[in-house]
Amino acid sequence: MILYEYPFNERIRTLLRLEDLFERFAFFLAQEDPREHHVALTTLFEIAEVTGRADLKSDLMKELERQRQTLAPFRGNPGIEQNALEAVLGEIEQTLANLAQMQGKTGQHLVDNEWLASIRSRAVIPGGTCKFDLPSYYAWQQWPAEQRRQDIAKWIMPLLPLRDAAAIVLRLARESGQASKVMAMQGSYQQMLSGRSYQLMQVRVPPELRVIPEASANKYMLWVRFTMQDGDVRPRAVDIDVPFHLTLCNL
């Protein structure tokens, strides 16, 4: 099944973007070629841009604290797997402590590093990081891969508590949902939400159908419409019945 996820609010949308950026960063950092490490570095700049929101850290701390207060009363409950509960609570408490230790403006260490700031300013220009534009950066790219990797890992380190916090919040949200099998009649599906508030919608479709879900929602109803794309033309609505799995997640 192919999984599509749709956020219901700006906070989850931001966390999904962060998750995607950190996954891309980890992939390219693990590679060897200087061009791949260039992608890792420019992705680091994107992460800094997203995490630079003034309220992101406080939002994450509030949500983690809320989850801690929700889960803590289940300690000692015989109906709850205590080892799993303690693992989650320990992870939350450690991440809260790491967030609390973050000092100053998020990503300021990248701004204060003049060399990185010069690369960052050139990276937004198409072809702006050529060897004649940034000879010192080109020289750094000739260093051994492990040394470059250590440098980039050092620069991402102050942002890792935000990665860990986002991962916990998204995991708890995803685990809160229960998948149901539904059918989009002639490619369209609607469901009343009865005023319930959700954070995230997941749509899983069989890959062999080659359909693409487009989703929208408000506090009363959600819509899922399926399209299909042939080659490089614009996707078109389908008129076939589409079976899929729908999961609504709420923290």
Swiss-Prot record:
Its main location: cytoplasm. GO terms for biological process: division septum assembly; FtsZ-dependent cytokinesis. It is found in: Cytoplasm. GO terms for cellular component: cell division site; cytoplasm. It holds the Pfam family ZapD. Keywords: Cell cycle, Cell division, Cytoplasm, Septation. Interacts with FtsZ. This is Cell division protein ZapD. It comes from Burkholderia ambifaria (strain MC40-6). The lineage of its organism: Bacteria, Pseudomonadati, Pseudomonadota, Betaproteobacteria, Burkholderiales. The gene is zapD.
